[in-house]
Curated annotation (Swiss-Prot):
It comes from Arabidopsis thaliana (Mouse-ear cress). This is Chalcone synthase. InterPro entries: Chalcone/stilbene_synt_C, Chalcone/stilbene_synt_N, Chalcone/stilbene_synthase_AS, Polyketide_synthase_type-III, Thiolase-like. SUPFAM superfamilies: Thiolase-like (SSF53901). Its EC number is 2.3.1.74. The keyword Acyltransferase applies. Pathway: Secondary metabolite biosynthesis; flavonoid biosynthesis. Keywords: Acetylation, Acyltransferase, Flavonoid biosynthesis, Transferase. One of its GO terms (cellular component) is endoplasmic reticulum. Belongs to the thiolase-like superfamily. Chalcone/stilbene synthases family. The primary product of this enzyme is 4,2',4',6'-tetrahydroxychalcone (also termed naringenin-chalcone or chalcone) which can under specific conditions spontaneously isomerize into naringenin.
Length: 395
């Protein structure tokens, strides 16, 4: 009896699991209509925050914006709104209620825009969605943005939800890792992944004693991205993976305590950055790559397609130097940084979308710039690094 029971349990467990790897079946992105040009932003920022008397600081901020390699950024906050809410423009004025009132509504709404596009590309009824993974660093509420999205989209009430708050910039990798595990361990699962970020929680005026906060004001922007993730695509209804996920890992870098911190206060979400973040990442990236690609026998990092969270150009520059990467390796990453800025968790998903679109446009052999294997890196508070090994598909 024991053997029969064990056998049937094994059979049940086997039947519950997918046969193949998790794949990204569709991608959708969305941004607020309002956008700012980086070249004009220092003048706008110091004017709207009533800080034009801080001329030296404004010059520093101009240099930060120039070095950012960003051309434009999308932002929900408009000049009209900020004029009506001057407490959000001061550096340390109590303003959390106003910020929360914005993000608890706008974060799921922007997420819905991206999700609708992903579901449309997927081409299947939304009733087939079994799981929702929602990620944001913009505000906290109960019930959460996952619940609000479920209602906005009209998903089944029995959909299984996971809400991730306050993870930061590495979380685009985290959601892929979680979606991979859900898809591969639940036969027939279709996971809707949404990352939605709005800088209304972090926007504030300048301070000449907190330059790390000013760095964030030069980089951060708003955007949402959504994916449908599932294993064993049903080709009879047109499902086809864009990328497959082979492995996923997370690690805390040594000697990196306090390198990136964020704290929710009465004044909103405050960020603190150390100057040596690019150095800490580049110093440890070889170890992450070795661990991820040793099973595949790959050690030529130029043979991979690259998707790296664009925390800023200095991080990308130092990673390129450390690994001897060719300039074109970070093309998709730098393009997204230039056209959208740092959208925190949503960035790497935007880069996936950019890469598959450019690959199709250029007529190369695969979704990964013509290459078979790729890597996706998320970097963020901790310092935490997410490493996802990707397999492209033929075009």
């Amino acid at each position: 009896m024991v053997m029969a029971g064990a056998s049937s349990l094994d059979e049940i467990r086997q039947a519950q699991r997918a046969d193949g790897p998790a794949g990204i079946l569709a991608i959708g992105t969305a941004n607020p209509e309002n956008h700012v040009l980086q070249a004009e932003y220092p003048d706008y920022y110091f004017r709207i925050t009533n800080s034009e008397h801080m001329t030296d600081l404004k010059e520093k901020f101009k240099r930060m914006c120039d070095k950012s390699t960003i051309r434009k950024r999308h932002m929900h906050l408009t000049e009209e709104f900020l004029k009506e809410n001057p407490h959000m423009c001061a550096y340390m004025a109590p303003s959390l209620d106003t910020r929360q009132d914005i993000v608890v509504v706008e974060v799921p709404k922007l997420g819905k825009e991206a999700a609708v596009k992903a579901i449309k590309e997927w081409g299947q009824p939304k009733s087939k969605i079994t799981h929702v993974v929602f990620c944001t660093t913009s505000g906290v509420d109960m019930p959460g943005a996952d619940y609000q999205l479920t209602k906005l989209l009209g998903l089944r009430p029995s959909v299984k939800r996971l809400m991730m708050y306050q993870q930061g910039c590495f979380a685009g990798g985290t959601v892929l890792r979680i979606a991979k595990d859900l898809a591969e361990n639940n036969r027939g699962a279709r996971v809707l992944v949404v990352c939605s970020e709005i800088t209304a929680v972090t926007f504030r005026g300048p301070s000449d004693t907190h330059l790390d906060s000013l760095v964030g004001q030069a980089l951060f922007s708003d955007g949402a991205a959504a994916l449908i993730v599932g294993s064993d695509p049903d080709t009879s209804v047109g499902e086809k993976p864009i990328f497959e996920m082979v492995s996923a890992a997370q690690t805390i870098l040594p000697d990196s305590d306090g390198a990136i911190d964020g704290h929710l206060r009465e004044v909103g979400l405050t960020f603190h950055l150390l100057k040596d973040v690019p150095g800490l990442i580049s110093k440890n990236i070889v170890k992450s790559l070795d661990e991820a690609f040793k099973p595949l026998g790959i050690s030529d990092w130029n043979s991979l397609f690259w998707i790296a969270h664009p925390g800023g150009p200095a991080i990308l520059d130092q990673v390129e130097i450390k690994l001897g990467l060719k300039e074109e390796k970070m093309r998709a990453t730098r393009h997204v940084l230039s056209e959208y800025g740092n959208m925190s968790s949503a960035c790497v998903l935007f880069i996936l979308d950019e890469m598959r679109r450019k690959s199709a446009k250029d007529g190369v052999a695969t979704t990964g710039e013509g290459l078979e294997w790729g890597v996706l890196f998320g970097f963020g508070p901790g310092l935490t690094v997410e490493t996802v090994v990707l397999h492209s598909v033929p075009l």
